């Protein structure tokens, strides 16, 4: 195994991509590798509060990341600097467990699912309502509703939460079901290890004999030809046997580079749904649920302040809440909006960029083509109205974080498939139509000046 300090740097690098910036900087950035005792990696946390928080909330993620990098199962032990406490390095009992190279699927489904990620703990909003409904339908009737279910969206918006929720629901209602959740990175590493150890059949038996396969971050298969080949056959085997497949990505299948066309087409067999950033009301609801789950007493004005400042994704939103609570605990002061501002000053940009709304787009497009705002929501199909409306839908998809149903609502309650059609039509025309390119450039320049 490589030097433990180099290993820990790699682990931190991977985790930094997976969690919010506030969470990483608050809990993990200042940690250091201490030693390797048997099968236990000992990590130094900056203080007792951080040690306890890391142990209860991040041990599982860290162990998973170490396994993804090294192929070895290591337990993790957190200590604090000797000058803060006389910490005895007692190894957890899990450190004595010997790892099997390829365990049966039933050996790990529950342990691979985060117990906090259930449908009950998922906060539904306009940006994730469709994805939630599709996930619940799949959980209630695996391989009968949508197969595969492909969920895409930015980092920290709830894709992984929904995948784990599906797994929990299936196991709760059918305890004998073989449910496997893993990242595409882990799938790749296990496949490489299987080839190296000359045990490909063990690997295939593990993943081709499950009832539900939940595979996260499929975009990381891009460019890995052998792994794509293996996953292609795994997909076919499961689909032919009516086993449920759920896939997540940060982008839709057609936008994943160097993904084989045969995989891309199979990902499009079922239902593709996106998740977009939560609106203000949803962000406040998320903070309330998180505070209740963790037993935090947070004033409403503080939650409103955090929700107004952090609008990118759920991980950063919850990370900001944790940072405020940690800051309050460490300096022993009551949580107020002023304290929250102080705690978050390093992660909130001083000047937030102007957010373009659908209404902004409709107004500017309407002025450009000399049509009324109400025409965007009307049923008129004349070209003088329909074409600008399609351009506005295209720009709403490109320049806002609104979901397809939300965009459709803002254009007179149109179906999300109408929005998809408009986006695809304008995208195709832009490749050859110089006049349309000119219109779009002028409209976007006006939007920048708002």
UniProtKB/Swiss-Prot annotation:
One MF annotation (Gene Ontology) recorded for this entry: ATP hydrolysis activity
Matching InterPro entries: AAA+_ATPase, Chromosome_initiator_DnaA, Chromosome_initiator_DnaA-like, Chromosome_initiator_DnaA_CS, DnaA_C, DnaA_dom, DnaA_N_dom, DnaA_N_sf
Binding site for ATP: 156, 158-160
Cellular-component GO terms for this entry: cytoplasm; plasma membrane
Residue segments, region Domain I, interacts with DnaA modulators: 1-84
Compartments in which it is found: Cytoplasm
Location of region: Domain II: 84-111
UniProt-annotated stretches for the region Domain IV, binds dsDNA: 329-450
Function in brief: Plays an essential role in the initiation and regulation of chromosomal replication. ATP-DnaA binds to the origin of replication (oriC) to initiate formation of the DNA replication initiation complex once per cell cycle. Binds the DnaA box (a 9 base pair repeat at the origin) and separates the double-stranded (ds)DNA. Forms a right-handed helical filament on oriC DNA; dsDNA binds to the exterior of the filament while single-stranded (ss)DNA is stabiized in the filament's interior.
Domain notes: Domain I is involved in oligomerization and binding regulators, domain II is flexibile and of varying length in different bacteria, domain III forms the AAA+ region, while domain IV binds dsDNA.
Stated name of the protein: Chromosomal replication initiator protein DnaA
Organism: Geobacillus thermodenitrificans (strain NG80-2)
Gene assigned in the entry: dnaA
